[in-house]
Regions:
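Conserved HGGG/HGGXW glycine-rich cap/lid loop of the alpha/beta-hydrolase fold
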Residues: 1-35
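Flexible "cap/lid" loop of the alpha/beta hydrolase fold
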Residues: 80-121
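Alpha/beta-hydrolase
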Residues: 113-182, 189
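Conserved hydrolase catalytic core segment
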Residues: 52-97
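Catalytic histidine-centered segment of alpha/beta-hydrolase-like enzymes
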Residues: 222-237
Length: 239
């Protein structure tokens, strides 16, 4: 189970904990600061812990990471499950901000834009603190009716703003160039996508971009659900 962010270590622990009741689960923490290094790091964990192809679940940014991993190391992947993935094509990006603004006050929306600008600046030195504040706003804009998980505070490690900035620049460039979606041509396993209808990341940016790329693709859209289905009051059981 691969966390999002980038830099949001421990945020999918609740998923891993529930799944571990029925099967073995790995929750790798991303410690590198470039996409090639993250892919190598993930491969090292998988090859050290597994002796057969596995199912990879990625949330948010983590969905992209498992998508790229499945393309680069197809021999290790039985299936990928993309939860709350960002859109795979640049043409959908503008919808994210528009959808988030609808869920925030005017002041919060302005603050959100300013935080993103500062996080993407090479001159900013307090990126960890800024990312924490951004996370608080995202918690409001991206969730429908989320409940607090008892272990969340101890599960989650401090956010890493520098890693977010470095990795996200690479990831956004891959999407802008079309290379991100191009990874689909090398993925041979079944692909499942799970998306909340209230998630600001447009469902069409996943569904329409991927449905003709794979022979075995299934899309589930959850009602009354935001970006993190496992902690949504009305959707977690279906998830």
């Amino acid at each position: 189970v691969v966390h999002g962010g980038p830099g949001a270590l421990g945020t999918v622990a609740a998923i891993a904990r529930v799944l571990s009741k029925d099967s073995g689960v790995i929750e790798p923490l991303q410690t590198s600061d470039s996409i090639p290094e993250l892919l190598n790091e993930l491969d090292e964990v998988i090859t050290a812990c597994c002796d057969r192809p596995i199912t990879l679940i990625g949330h948010s940014w983590g969905a992209w990471l498992v998508f790229m991993y499945a393309a680069k190391y197809p021999q290790w992947v039985k299936k990928i499950i993309l939860v709350g993935s960002g859109p795979f094509e640049a043409k959908y990006v503008s919808e994210i901000a528009c959808n988030r603004i609808k869920h925030l006050s005017d002041a919060e929306g302005a603050e959100f834009d300013e935080l993103l600008k500062r996080l993407n600046s090479d001159k900013e030195i307090e990126k960890g603190r800024l990312l924490e504040r951004l996370g608080a706003l995202v918690n409001k804009s991206d969730n429908y009716c989320a409940f607090e998980i008892d272990t969340e505070k101890e599960d989650c490690l401090p956010v890493e703003g520098d890693k977010y900035s470095a990795i996200w620049k690479e990831a956004a460039a891959l999407r802008e160039s079309g290379e991100l979606l191009g990874f689909a041509d090398r993925i041979i396993c079944p692909v499942v996508a799970i998306h909340g209808e209230y998630d600001p990341h447009p469902v069409d940016g996943v569904k329409l971009s991927l449905r003709n790329k794979f022979k075995d693709f299934i899309m589930y859209t959850l009602g009354k659900c935001g970006h993190s289905p496992w902690k949504e009051k009305h959707a977690y059981q279906e998830f």
